[in-house]
């Protein structure tokens, strides 16, 4: 029996050393140290031994089991260490290699234009205000000098939700709400970017939803010259330092006097081309002095305070600035179109 145990020990240790994987080592462990292994079978025959030989054989069997287990543990440790080294070698990163470029998207052209206009006016002391897109009839019309049954309401068809609420047709309500917060004390210098909604049929130049930026400046002794100077700054910033503007008389219920503002054509320099329709001028926005009724309804004394206001369509400015011929391009999510503004 002693020789058999020694033979099994030698045989098991040799198989452990020859194993090339953790699985093979485990197979050896099960084969020799398991309940059905040969060492267990040898131990079952100890009952045939004398009382004197039995303790010696038991101690020898335990010694053999411990040596085989130690060989298995050592082999497992070596194999695990080799596996770690192999994985580290496979996953080694050369830190001297240049990094992979990150795939970035592009800012939307409307976002670019809005941020450019916001930055300009913030540098001039204006703040940016926002308001609800679902507006009351009062703020969208009445507070802007368009009482019920006023004929000027026909100028823009609206999306009504109830009799007294609608999707705002302009960002002008933000101006009134802001003036009310000031409780009749100036100055008020704000711009109001946001979405507006009108019942237009979508085509190359019209959309039922579009972006608008309106501006308001209310203080003592504000005049048309202040308005003109502000708009000249906007035109030069957006379309180039060589640009000039001209004011044409117009009508808006919430301003008096009211003007349409044209900028000298940035394509032909005012000589006449297809962009300016041979006139040398391009219309960019509407403006005027805030109507006294609007000031009074917002809580300002129109005899002490004056103001000017202006409004521009962001899509129109972007179309002119980037030479885009169809407003629908802004809303189709076409990557080919949007990727052109990656460097903007």
From Swiss-Prot:
Q: Does the keyword Cytoplasm apply?
A: yes
Q: Which cysteines are joined by disulfide bonds?
A: none
Signal peptide positions (record): none
UniProt keyword annotations, A-Z: Aminoacyl-tRNA synthetase, ATP-binding, Cytoplasm, Ligase, Magnesium, Metal-binding, Nucleotide-binding, Protein biosynthesis
Top-level division of the source organism's lineage: Bacteria
Q: Where does Mg(2+) bind?
A: 256
Against NCBIfam families, the record matches this protein to: pheS
UniProt subunit comment: Tetramer of two alpha and two beta subunits.
State the name under which the record lists this protein.
Phenylalanine--tRNA ligase alpha subunit
Source species: Bacillus licheniformis (strain ATCC 14580 / DSM 13 / JCM 2505 / CCUG 7422 / NBRC 12200 / NCIMB 9375 / NCTC 10341 / NRRL NRS-1264 / Gibson 46)
Q: What is the name of the gene encoding this protein?
A: pheS
């Amino acid at each position: 029996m002693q020789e058999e145990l020694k033979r099994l020990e030698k045989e098991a240790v040799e198989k452990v050393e020859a194993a090339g994987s953790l699985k093979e080592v485990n197979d050896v462990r099960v084969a020799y140290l398991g309940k059905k292994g040969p060492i267990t079978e040898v131990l079952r025959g100890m009952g045939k031994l004398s009382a004197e030989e039995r303790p010696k054989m038991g101690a020898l069997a335990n010694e053999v089991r411990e040596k085989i287990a130690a060989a298995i543990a050592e082999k497992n440790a070596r194999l695990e260490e080799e596996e770690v080294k192999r994985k580290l070698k496979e996953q080694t990163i050369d830190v001297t290699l240049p990094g992979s470029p990150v795939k970035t998207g592009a800012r939307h052209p409307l976002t670019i234009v809005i941020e450019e206009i916001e930055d300009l006016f913030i540098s001039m002391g204006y703040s940016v205000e926002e308001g609800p897109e679902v507006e009351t009839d009062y703020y969208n019309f009445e507070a802007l000098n368009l009482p019920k049954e006023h004929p000027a309401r026909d100028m823009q068809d609206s999306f009504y939700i109830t009799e007294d609420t609608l999707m705002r047709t302009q960002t002008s309500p933000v101006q009134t709400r802001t003036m009310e917060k000031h409780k009749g004390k100036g100055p008020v210098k704000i711009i109001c970017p946001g979405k507006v909604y009108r019942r237009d049929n979508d085509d190359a130049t019209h959309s039922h939803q579009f972006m608008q930026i309106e501006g308001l400046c209310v203080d003592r002794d504000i005049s048309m010259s202040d308005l003109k100077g502000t708009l000249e700054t906007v035109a030069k910033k957006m379309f180039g330092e060589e640009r000039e503007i001209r004011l044409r008389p117009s009508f808006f219920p919430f301003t008096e006097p009211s003007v349409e503002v044209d900028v000298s054509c940035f394509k032909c320099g005012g000589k006449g081309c297809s962009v300016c329709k041979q006139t040398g001028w391009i219309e960019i926005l509407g403006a005027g002095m805030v109507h006294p009724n609007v000031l009074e309804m917002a809580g300002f004394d129109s005899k002490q305070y004056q103001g000017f206001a202006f409004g521009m369509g962001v899509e129109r400015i972007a179309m002119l600035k980037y030479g885009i011929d169809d407003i629908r391009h802004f809303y189709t999510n076409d990557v080919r179109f949007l990727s052109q503004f990656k460097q903007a």
